[in-house]
Amino acid sequence: MQDIQLDKRLSELLSQAVTPQTAQPLMQALSQSLNEHNIRYYVDDAPSITDSEYDRLMQQLKKLEAEYPQFVLADSPTQRVGGLALAKFEQITHLKPMLSLDNAFDEADFTAFHKRVSDRVGQVSFCCEPKLDGLAVSILYRNGVLERAATRGDGTVGEDITENVKTIKSIPLRLRGNNYPELVEVRGEAFMPKAAFEALNERARLKDDKQFVNPRNAAAGSLRQLDSKITASRALSFYAYALGVVEPSSHELAKTHYEQLQQLKSWGLPVSSEIKVCDELNQVFAYYKDILTRRSDLPFEIDGVVMKVNDIAQQQTLGFVAKSPRWAIAYKFPAQEEMTLLEGVDFQVGRTGAVTPVARLKPVFVGGVTVSNATLHNADEIERLGVMVGDTVIIRRAGDVIPQIVAIVPERRSEDAQAIVFPQHCPVCGSLVERLEGEAVARCSGGLFCEAQRKEAIKHFASRKALDIDGMGDKIVEQLIDKELVQSPADLFKLTASMMTMLDRMGMKSATNLALAIEAAKTTTLPRFLYALGIREVGEATAANLAAHFGSLDALRIATIEQLIEVEDIGEVVAQHVAHFFAQPHNLEVIDALIAAGVNWPAIEAPSADEQPLKGQTWVLTGTLNQLNRNDAKAQLQVLGAKVAGSVSKNTDCLVAGEAAGSKLAKAQELGVKVIGEDELLALLAANR
């Protein structure tokens, strides 16, 4: 009801002319509305307005605050952007010490903790939650307004990070409702989500800046910035996990820890959705195992789970020891970082030709498994780490992610440590290893000639969107190569039915059908053939544009980068990939062998303007088409000149909606994009044949 009244009040104020008399209540209403929508988005996970509407209201508030600075509110959402840089952090003495937790490392440790607790207070339930790997923060609200925030520090004295905490969008500047205490201290974890961490390091990599080792370091470094504008750019988040000081002490609070967290949530503070109450010991262990199993899928880093006695009265009875509460414990996951010795480096070649350095390690137990190899990514990463063979290194393994070296221990470097030399020739086929300007990855130039790339290249060549060899699945391709019946794509067209009966579970009838499918695939189109070659970043649409622009393979083979850039939707990077592919003798040999084997396509005639009525238009397909498969519809629209995109935007000219059309249809209707059905599409295609 309060939300409805707020929206109604804002609408009334927005409909009035802005004057010095109406500006202040309008700014108050805008601030209140935007803060409420922030809570709905970050806490309730139930946004009630679009991003564009939110942005419009925010811009309106910023404009008003620029005109009437005397009316700017302390809890205005515009205050999240960061203010003037500080000279240093002030010290804050916590009203109540921020203690650390004891640790349990296995079931025996937790069972002993459970016994100590139950011996004192009897039967207990536990409130269980993920142990976030971030920075502990204390936030003080007075009369519902965020007054100050501090780091844990040594538990007694922390640093004032108020301005930085205000930039975290999930933390309300004013509490929701009115049933909160006059003064309330909220404790929780500030952290950097995995996606934000990856984006931050990607920006650093592009600028050749130092990258953070892990999200915890990134979160801590971001919160301890003297310039809060930097913190504002770091996309930090926050989960509340406890109440601290509450005044007056007589204020009615929930009687269990779980219910107090729900109380915090009702005030607009975010809490983890992974919190669960466990009544039995076996439920606690099941919770631990479940979170551990899903650890790599969670959007944030965790290093264990925290178990707290749920009943607040029991917590008070149990009390504290010197540095930790008796009623809580951190049940830690196996360590994800360990030190070991780098014994050597091997270089592997992937299906796209990427040459990746792989570290050979002295086996070490980390993240629950024994690790003997780790990725070094590329030459830039080797240089950034300053790593050498013989170094002591820090290994990190997170979930199912390939283990990686995140740092070296320089003080342990031996005198006989050796520099890592990146190969100039492919370790598999001997072709030149090249690294294009602006790219971090070095690649084997062998292309289809390179055995390491061959299996994936041939799978791609035979796939439905390429030459579409019916019945030629991945397992058959693997067998053909393993039995040395096929060495290159051209060898597919030398296969006979009798040769293919050598494959597992391949009788003469199946082999004959596959041989017929191979023969039929010889007749294709130039766009399909170009796509089948597997040129980097040349998808179906780009292949079609290349074919339409140059008209023949011969013309494309000798095209310069300048000529390639003239093709629709092709920039300098893709142009370089195409030119580079056709400059390799190995690739030309494969192409010539395919043509000699009988692969052919009809000549392309340049379409007239009348034949391309959709030229310059962007179309999108969604839902199920009953009379035309998606790829055929896409190809026919491209013949008529349309660009077929994968998503709807304001630049979309038409959406073809089949059965069970979903979010794309809704977005098209929202944007006012023209929508037609399958029957209208068929009529359009028939009229332009």
From Swiss-Prot:
One GO term of the biological process aspect: DNA replication
Cellular component terms (Gene Ontology): cytosol
Highest taxon of source: Bacteria
Binding site for Zn(2+): C426, C429, C444, C450
Cofactor: Mg(2+); Mn(2+)
Entry-linked Pfam families: BRCT, DNA_ligase_aden, DNA_ligase_OB, DNA_ligase_ZBD, HHH_2, HHH_5, Nlig-Ia
Keywords attached to this entry: DNA damage, DNA repair, DNA replication, Ligase, Magnesium, Manganese, Metal-binding, NAD, Zinc
EC supergroup of this enzyme: ligase
Keyword Transcription regulation part of the UniProt annotation: no
Active site: K131
PROSITE patterns tied to this protein: BRCT, DNA_LIGASE_N1, DNA_LIGASE_N2
Reactions catalysed: NAD(+) + (deoxyribonucleotide)n-3'-hydroxyl + 5'-phospho-(deoxyribonucleotide)m = (deoxyribonucleotide)n+m + AMP + beta-nicotinamide D-nucleotide
UniProt-listed Enzyme Commission number(s): 6.5.1.2
InterPro entries referenced in this protein's UniProt entry, alphabetically: BRCT_dom (IPR001357), BRCT_dom_sf (IPR036420), DisA/LigA_HHH (IPR041663), DNA_ligase (IPR001679), DNA_ligase_AS (IPR018239), DNA_ligase_CS (IPR033136), DNAligase_adenylation (IPR013839), DNAligase_N (IPR013840)
CDD domains (UniProt xref): BRCT_DNA_ligase_like, LIGANc
A GO term, aspect molecular function: metal ion binding
Family: Belongs to the NAD-dependent DNA ligase family. LigA subfamily.
Summary of the function given for this chain in its UniProt record: DNA ligase that catalyzes the formation of phosphodiester linkages between 5'-phosphoryl and 3'-hydroxyl groups in double-stranded DNA using NAD as a coenzyme and as the energy source for the reaction. It is essential for DNA replication and repair of damaged DNA.
PANTHER family recorded: CHROMOSOME TRANSMISSION FIDELITY FACTOR 18, DNA LIGASE
Protein name: DNA ligase
Source species: Shewanella oneidensis (strain ATCC 700550 / JCM 31522 / CIP 106686 / LMG 19005 / NCIMB 14063 / MR-1)
The organism's taxonomic lineage, starting at the top: Bacteria, Pseudomonadati, Pseudomonadota, Gammaproteobacteria, Alteromonadales
Name of the gene: ligA
